[in-house]
Amino acid sequence: VGTSGKIVAIASHLPGRVLSNDDLAALYPSWPADKILDKTGVQTRHIAAPGETAVDLAQAAAEALFAQGRVAPSDIDYLLFCTQAPDHILPTSACILQRRLGLRTDIGALDFNLGCSGFVYGLSMAQALIASGQARRVLLLTADTYSKLIHPMDRGVRSLFGDGAAATLIEAVETDTPALGPFVFGTDGSGAENLIVPAGGFRQPRTAQTAVVTEDASGNLRSADHLYMNGAAIMTFTLGAVPAAIDKLLARAGATLDDYDAVVLHQASAFILDRLRRKLAVPEDRFVVALRDWGNTVSSTIPMALEPLVRDGRPRRVLLVGFGVGYSWAAAQALL
């Protein structure tokens, strides 16, 4: 018997403004609403208001979690915040969230900058903190506002991404079998340029030059200040890295895909998910697809897809895989 972290509660939050396929079709005459749904699997996406940040969304998700009554703010002894949209270069947004949420001051709190793999990385850190006795209850917040990085006429990415946040409570349990893990990680910085906001950091500060908008071969508009995604390269990376990571995880867990009640992958797009499901030969009833109403919410797609499974309280063995920007990826087993 040992101490393990376990996912015991999840709550998500979506900003109020909704961007529908009809809204997008009005901007892109060659893309009717049904074509956008067919291509992306997304019907609507939620968009943060001007002045509404990832920190605001994360706060709302955490407050929704506390409202479930399972845990109080004073019970949290470590805060992990995954975002690529901090309020400030410094201080760390997790410190701002500690104060806003009324958490104790004798806790650990930090941000980490990952995208689509971030939730699984966050689970691994929570598990390490709990198994080593450094924390009993870890609050993992994931939030992003990619809408603020996307040029309105870059239809490829604008149709896919939505803003949102999730709050996940990982709690210590005494158990024979760890409720989190094993984990498999992957990193390949040679793909960094395929999903990137080139300007705005210290390598390439924003200037009048970086704000110059150009049109690509597909008619999408963007500048160096905006998000760029090489969809074809991302697809190739995903179809190679994800099945390989799953094979590695299954070997470590001594399991087959049939042993899992649910397979929850990062909800990149309906097209990528369908390709992966077929490649992995997972039946549709055990393969979670949850992006129609909110799109690709980056680090929050997996917890948002898990939320109904955690809420219904039925014990399940689930396989989680996050993958994307970096390139960064991670796979994990979780017992709910």
What are these regions (language model features)?
Residues 11, 82, 113, 138-144, ...:
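Short beta-strand segments
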Residues 7-9, 36, 65, 79, ...:
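Buried hydrophobic positions in well-ordered alpha/beta secondary-structure cores of metabolic enzymes
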Residues 18-19, 90-92, 150-154, 329-333:
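Short acidic, glycine/serine/threonine-rich loops at helix termini
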Residues 70-105:
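Anion-binding (especially nucleotide phosphate/pyrophosphate-binding) glycine-rich loop
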Residues 131-165:
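Flexible, glycine-rich active-site loops centered on histidine and acidic residues
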Residues 29-38, 88-102, 140-146, 209-219, ...:
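Acidic-glycine-rich active-site phosphate/pyrophosphate-binding loop
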Residues 1-50, 154-236, 240, 244, ...:
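Condensing-enzyme catalytic core mediating Claisen C-C bond formation in acyl metabolism
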Residues 55, 59-62, 85-86, 99, ...:
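Claisen-condensing/thiolase-fold acyl-transfer catalytic domains that form or cleave C-C bonds
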